[in-house]
């Protein structure tokens, strides 16, 4: 039996699942992650908190299914969209991550949309 872990780093929280190769769920864990809104239109998260929260979820999976966790063959990851996470040269987080739903550049986006057909240029509309 092959075992795998799936981890989803979502805007509202971290979710982890331990599954058997036939998609049978062995264990599930989730933990919320707070979104900071220091000003109107801002949406940020503490990227260091993501790491500790992932480990919390993995610890819960291990507590629920220790033998299965020891036999994991792979880990799949998914994450939120477009989070701007700034790191120094050692990998240390420099500031809270600016999330995909942060609206502080709304006016600039409107100007770009009016000047350029961004969907044709980039394949994505902000």
Briefly describe each language-model feature range.
Residues 49, 53:
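Charged catalytic carboxylate motif
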Residues 3, 48, 63-66:
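Intrinsic disorder/low-complexity segments
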Residues 4, 9-47, 92-100:
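Short glycine-rich, Thr/Ser-proximal phosphate-binding strand/loop in the N-terminal lobe
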Residues 56-126:
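Glycine-rich phosphate-binding/catalytic subdomain of phosphoryl-transfer
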């Amino acid at each position: 039996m092959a075992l795998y872990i799936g981890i989803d780093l979502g805007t509202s929280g971290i979710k982890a699942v331990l599954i058997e190769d036939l998609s049978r769920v062995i264990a599930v864990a989730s933990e919320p992650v707070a979104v900071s809104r220091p000003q109107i239109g801002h949406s940020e998260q503490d990227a260091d908190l993501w790491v500790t929260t992932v480990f919390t979820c993995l610890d819960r999976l291990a507590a629920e299914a220790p033998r299965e966790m020891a036999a994991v063959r792979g880990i799949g990851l998914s994450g939120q969209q477009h989070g701007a996470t700034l790191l120094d040269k050692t990998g240390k987080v420099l500031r809270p991550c600016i999330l995909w739903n942060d609206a502080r550049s709304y006016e600039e986006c409107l100007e770009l949309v009016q000047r350029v057909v961004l969907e044709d240029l980039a394949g994505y509309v902000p």
